[in-house]
Regions:
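Short intrinsically disordered, low-complexity coil segments enriched in acidic
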Residues: 1-6, 164, 173-174
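Intrinsically disordered, low-complexity N-proximal targeting/linker segments that flank membranes
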Residues: 69-169, 173
């Protein structure tokens, strides 16, 4: 493992950059910590000739990533999925017809949105990241939610309207 330690470390750094582009700024907001492993491996493999920096490659990596999150595919039995995904994504980058298993098997039932009430859910964290990515603004300052605002304002994804406020106003839970 020592032979590849520096390359893998660089891969994790690149994976962090991709996650920040997708508005995942902290480990507590990471939908699946387990999906970070194949993401970092892919970033490591694609570092050669800076392939990971190209838009077309990055777009496919992000598509694979979000299919894994919203398909809720990294909750258990991940070691086999790591292999399928790394091999599958690398093949997909060479041949667009070779879609990786996670992208092929992706399915998100919209009814699932009604049950996302816990910030511990990967899909909940994913939705919050997608909201942040789509130019949402801070309620107080009106500034677009970027890394600077996220850190400066100690943004948390657990709720928009505080429970105590809703209860005092008699608002229904759902």
């Amino acid at each position: 493992y020592q032979r590849y330690a520096n390359d893998l470390t660089d891969g994790f750094v690149e994976a962090e950059k991709i996650l920040q582009e997708e508005r995942i700024f902290s480990s507590k907001d990471l939908p699946y910590t387990t999906q970070l492993i194949p993401l970092a491996v892919l970033c490591t493999l694609l570092a050669e000739h800076n392939r990971i920096k190209t838009t077309s490659v990055k777009d496919k990596i992000k598509q694979w990533y979000w299919c894994g999150v919203f398909g809720e595919m990294y909750g258990s039995a991940n070691e086999t999925r790591y292999v399928y995904d790394v091999v599958g994504v690398m093949a997909w980058l060479e041949d667009a017809s070779k879609t990786p298993k996670t992208v092929q098997e992706f399915y998100f039932n919209p009814v699932r949105l009604l049950s996302l009430q816990s910030r511990l859910s990967a899909a909940y964290k994913g939705i919050m990241a997608r909201i942040l990515k789509n130019q949402c603004k801070d309620f107080i300052s009106g500034r677009e939610m970027d890394f600077t605002v996220y850190k400066a304002e100690s943004i948390d994804i657990h709720h928009i309207f505080p429970r105590d406020y809703c209860e005092k106003k008699g608002l229904p839970r759902a």
